[in-house]
């Protein structure tokens, strides 16, 4: 019997009836699909056997020029495979999307860690999808560029009311995808993106009374950087180094170190710093030129702060979960191990107990929905900086 290949091919009705990215219509649609998320999450926390679907999107929606300098960046998408542990709940389904297929042996490794559930049972509730595209383009952008893949995901979502999208990081791209899929996004609205930047973070800490390195925020130009470097030097003539950081740099690769030359702290200080900037500024990412660094700095904005000196420096990290209702819970803490010439690059982490450091959230009587209004207290830690 002869079978027509076309008759076996899956067909999809591709819908182009989506609001334009960034439009008022998209923001309205996003708000509408997000309004019941808090109730749904509370339901799942109470009823472990409630059916639900999680669309896992480990997209690194970061600056692609900087990301391309990191070897093996595409494998960062495997970091969210820990979400497969949700399959221990027998009515939970997961749709996991990657740029390139994940090796079966890696998936099997995670599934065999599930307590009380066989790997075969979990496999039946797991769908792995791939774009078959190893380029440095954001995974979310790859999906949006493939309408058939978007429709495939939508067909796998049998109950949008019990489904949500969870991502590695959230940008307007993820917001657009959530609207196109018609499911809520478990994460902060990208409209609050500034609060998560280095400039926004410094302002949050300052307003919360947390000690942080002397520095300046919301800088964009070389002239801004020079003025900030000069102001720090005037405040502390013994200062040897300062750090210039892009707002949205990551793993330390968006940083540069400025080493002050032996110049007098006088009226010519700014001019001397400007003239020596190219010689005294060193980018942390070896493959990022100064030209590219300043170009990205103009696009993202950034900060300048003093370089923290000392033989023993700790870099604690805390992971917090902010519910749609504004409740903040601490999930975990760890100590970052930094390397590189100036100790700016994340290389590993340790979960060993940090006896001298305790992180406590002191909530106000009226719980705020904004993270920067929560009180953070770090004991025995004099300064907090942002990688």
Where on the chain are the PLM-derived regions?
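A long amphipathic alpha-helix within ATP-dependent nucleotide-binding catalytic cores
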Residues: 291-312, 316, 330, 342-387
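N-terminal accessory/precursor segments of enzymes
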Residues: 172, 184-186, 192-194, 199-206, ...
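Glycine-rich beta-alpha junction loops
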Residues: 101, 246-250, 308, 322, ...
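Beta-strand scaffold of nucleotide-dependent catalytic cores
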Residues: 256, 305, 314-336
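Short acidic, glycine/serine/threonine-rich loops at helix termini
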Residues: 68, 108, 177-180, 228, ...
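Flexible loop/turn segments at secondary-structure boundaries
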Residues: 63-65, 103-106, 173-174, 250-253, ...
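ATP-binding N-terminal substructure of ATP-dependent carboxylate-amine bond-forming enzymes
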Residues: 1-196
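Active-site nucleotide/adenylate-binding loops and adjacent lid/helix of ATP-dependent enzymes
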Residues: 189-301, 350-367
